């Protein structure tokens, strides 16, 4: 039940409904309502006050919701004593405010600069990032009891084998100490569970409430009232938030990587939901039109890659050490992707639901725990493979759908990042994914550059790798001379698709993998080289004359040939292209400049739509069949003469139209089948031209989904702020890449200026009237006809948390931190000294003075103070044990950097002094 009451007013009239509001408007006396039923409830207070000059009166309306009966009785007793109740509420509000501030402070949400809107916006971004993805409960400290509970939930056998080890753990220990103790046990199964363990709290599901997984609940206590560690969310979103969180908690990066790859399937995809309890997937419900299954594979590569890149930056040797370690699992999702031939025959219906497998999985979960949803070996244990295998399988899955000059074929029944493009499924190919794959390939090449010796792979994966490499080798001679022929494109698509299809046939068994085999590393590096050549060729083919890039193309499948046609300009494609690493700094600047002159720029918001706005045809302008086309098809000519309106009919104005019963070409085929007796051989003779005419009239192939027919969310005229913030971060990456490559100063200046021009369009730079909402809060989207919509429900927060730390110049490479303020502006530095309150690594509130010409922020909960001065750049490090020391330049040694990464508390403060000349002008 819900309890509502008030404090601070003497004998007010209390209304439990809105029935007396008109009487109030007429100035009539209101009568207290003690009970109402059958109508919508409310709670209003009415009284008269007399205030002396400069006087004040305060009162409160308090609501407490979802209470059990015993709790209601407690509240009633409390509010019988208004004085005590007021004290309890004031204490609760203060405690809640402090606890929320501690949560945000622990994720580095507090900053102090001369631009208050910037720091307030950063606070909001950090807060919403936590609300979506959660936060680590106690820094790097974990509870042995909670870890043991997690092991027991996941795998009862492993828990029983290691009860003695688990019982011997100290109750509170660091995640590093926990891993070390687990490794001493010598059981890879337990080590896998340790790497998957994420002590996260406070996060709640997010997003569109119409989706079944979004039930907006922050669960902080269990049924017994004990503190609860929990998280859940759509995998496409929660891993984004964990990326930004891991930047402040780098010690957990490899654990997040493990959680990601351990949830991917044998066929290379991730099920739609991830929770502390394990993985989850959509279940097919026959007869339910809203039930749907399939895989989103679009940003799987880039989300994983961003985590891998963080690991290499912070811990340069750690991934290499894990590459060969058999600590990673496969999710066992009861989806079965059809054969290549079946996909070609109907690319929109490609995934079957295996109910027999679903039942077996349920039995295994009941027997062993959540690990029953993973692939098991012949002995009933979780089948574990190396990290390298887990990194190769999603790449091979994408290459199995690679269309040269086109992108990655969207044939797993789900769209890409933009759900509004859902109609692209089946006949769309994604350059977006291909741009990100290029970056992924380069990363793997760098990761393996110093590795030698053979690797262990599952035999079926090794064969898939070899078949894919052979298909890419056959394609190689056709590359580099402009787009390949339609026939060559089909041959390569078929070869790659059949390789993936044979692999799926092999692993869609009760026991998917037969054995592990030793594979020369050269086979892997050869695959990467061949794939990169084909992808670079395709990227060149998709650059437009204006310097922008295609995002998606459309497939046109014919007998023995495959053609691709580009769709219209999309912001998503430009962001992915900028992120690919394929564009030189000067070309990157030209691309962004072209966007400001393009049809996706909205001058009223100083920002970018997802795609160009365009007028839609009216109802009567649709479904118009040219009379000449009707006359040219014998069947239509005969049916029209006979007055048979079952395929086309003529309206009173003489316009021919297809039957209103038809939803798509399948309905046309069904009608033709039904007409066989009446029209005989004319049916088959007219089928192909009729189908062609139907597509010419409706152009269904070009229909992208609600993106081309709606106006809110990701519709026409809409700005989607997450994609704008992705653009911002991509420009920042190109800015720093230009500096690292020693690009000319003019190009660097252009990129920096373009960064701030894009940033200027974000809400926190606008008035409430211009933005249509609270400017400092992140919002999902701004349609063309309204202000910003859906507060906080956006991946924008993750991008902007990272881009903000980039603005401040935090750059990590080779396990060391350096400060690079060349994107920071002088307007952020204060003119007068001010106080800055922050939460330190020991969870204590501290305060420091920010000097004039300074600013302050925290990172890994270490306070960092910047100060502009006329001398050379230098650092002042205040340490817990070593006192104060000064270092020339702006780079920290790896040892000191590691103290910060580990949140050891040794580094208490860093002061960074540098001249104005280093700032962005």
Residue ranges: model-predicted function:
Residues 1-921:
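Acidic, mature catalytic/reactive cores of soluble proteins
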